[in-house]
Design a protein with these regions (language model features):
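Long amphipathic alpha-helical segments
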Residues: 1-46
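N-terminal glycine-rich anion-binding loops that anchor highly charged ligand groups
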Residues: 7-26, 53-55, 187-190, 312-313, ...
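Glycine-rich phosphate-binding segment of PLP-dependent enzymes
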Residues: 18, 57-58, 68-93
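Glycine-rich, N-terminal phosphate-binding loop and its surrounding beta-alpha-beta segment
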Residues: 27-65, 69-71
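Short Gly/Ser/Thr- and Asp/Glu-enriched loop/turn motifs at secondary-structure junctions
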Residues: 55-59, 268-272, 367, 394-400
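Conserved PLP-enzyme active-site core in the AAT-like
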Residues: 94-300, 304-307, 418
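Conserved PLP-dependent catalytic core of the aminotransferase class-I/II
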Residues: 142, 302-303, 307-358
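Conserved C-terminal alpha-helix-loop-beta "cap" of PLP-dependent enzymes
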Residues: 335-411
């Protein structure tokens, strides 16, 4: 029976799956003559559950469930070179112990015009570290319109409570003025937290207070910029894309007077998962000295990947980062690829689509795109067969759509082959 199971699985795993199938038969859960089939199905399900590459044909560039920003050759090469011994906490110039905050964090701070930086394992951890360091036992002012919930049910008030800080809600959900903050100030206030609403947008009768206005206060202003757009001007691109309108830039927050800015590494920055904190050196040094900094620190591979990403921005080569390359690929180029795929697969049509950034960024803003679509008798059957080939499409009404903006050109042939193999399920 073991030889019938996926040979990529270790022998011990295949043996355990076979035992589970036999046990199921003994309990009467399956018929005795279905043991082999049950074991094969268990192996198939496990093989698909294990981490591995997938073709993201959803049109969601920063798909959280599919790993957000894909890494390019430069970042992967940097991570590979750091996989052995590396000077993660060693100063080669002096021959003494160093700090893991001297590499990627410092370069990322330079890239957005800040004095210093530190890297932790995600942006929620970054906010947690800032609040625990600067506001434990004291009050934090937050606009009611910025008490956001991020993915997985985690909410800003709950994160704040875990740090021992006290939440002081300011203004109303739709309108918060500078005068609202003024009235809430007291000696108990440690800082003002401004949260960029990167996963939703309010329109209509709304008002908010800018970082520059808040920076007039004596209390430090901390900005959770979330999405991680380093610079609103996007100097690494030929022109600023229209779908980036109103997106908050880290550099602009620093220039406006923010004491600290936190953001994600695997969103618009285009790097590995990380939480990045940049700002004034005095505050960053306090963060580095807090016990939580060690508990939340990033590993050497993450730091190496971010170092390469920072190099790309500092050298003006960020357009080569996969996220930006895919997001800015001309629609005409996508259409040419779609026509090639459609020409080789019966029943497949070229369609204009709309991609999105995803990952809790740029809500409501679409990116014009192009892909291929199929109208099968059974949408569920076709998508299941594509997923078995590790291809994740999206479903629009009764169509299965593969949006090429999120498909690497190197995977076009693989996508076409999978669609041909499912031809019987697409008509």
């Amino acid at each position: 029976m073991l030889t019938e199971l996926d040979p990529a699985l270790p022998h011990a795993v295949r043996a355990e799956l076979a035992r589970e199938a036999v046990d199921a038969a003994r309990r009467g859960a399956i018929a005795p003559d279905h043991v082999s089939r049950d074991a094969r199905e268990r192996a198939r399900v496990l093989s698909l559950a294990l981490l591995g590459p997938v073709v993201n044909a959803t049109g969601v560039l920063l798909h959280t469930n599919l790993g957000r920003a894909p890494l390019g050759a430069a970042a992967l090469d940097s991570m590979t070179r750091a996989s052995g011994y590396t000077n993660v906490e060693y100063r080669l110039a002096e021959g003494v112990r160093g700090s893991r905050h001297e590499h990627a964090g410092a370069l990322l701070a330079m890239a957005c015009g800040a004095e210093a930086g530190i890297v932790v394992n995600n942006n929620a951890a970054a906010v947690l570290l800032v609040l625990a360091t600067l506001a434990r036992g004291r009050s934090v002012l937050v606009s009611r319109g910025e008490l956001v919930e991020i993915g997985g049910g985690f909410r800003i008030p709950e994160i704040l409570a875990e740090t021992g800080a006290r939440l002081v809600e300011v203004g109303t959900t739709n309108r918060t003025r500078l005068s609202d903050y003024e009235r809430a100030r007291s000696e108990e206030v440690a800082l003002v937290l401004k949260v960029h609403t990167s996963n939703y947008r309010m329109i209509g009768f709304v008002a908010s207070t800018s970082v520059a206005e808040l920076a007039r206060f004596d209390e430090p202003v901390v900005v959770d910029a979330g999405s991680g757009l380093l610079d609103e001007a996007t100097p690494w691109l030929r022109e600023r894309p229209p779908w980036l309108r109103d997106e908050l830039g880290v550099r602009q927050c620093i220039e406006a007077g923010a004491a600290l800015v936190t953001f994600s590494g695997d969103k618009l920055l285009g790097g590995p998962q990380a939480g990045i904190i940049v700002g004034r050196r005095a505050f960053v040094d306090r963060l580095k000295a807090h016990p939580l900094a060690r508990a939340l620190r990033a590993d050497k591979l993450t730091l190496a990947g971010l170092q390469a990403i920072a190099h790309a921005y500092l050298s003006g080569d960020a357009a080569s980062i996969p996220f930006w390359r895919m997001a800015c690929e001309p629609v005409d180029a996508l259409r040419v690829r779609a026509e090639v795929i459609a020409a080789g697969v019966p029943g497949v049509k070229v369609v204009d689509t709309e991609a999105v950034a995803g990952g809790g960024t740029l809500p409501g803003l679409a990116i014009p795109s192009c892909g291929v679509a199929v109208e099968p008798p059974s949408v569920n059957a076709l998508t299941a067969r594509l997923r078995a080939a590790r291809i994740v499409p999206r479903v629009d009404d009764d169509r299965v759509v593969c949006d090429l903006r999120t498909v690497d050109p190197a995977d076009d042939a693989r996508l076409a082959a999978a669609l041909r193999a499912t031809d019987g399920h697409s008509r």
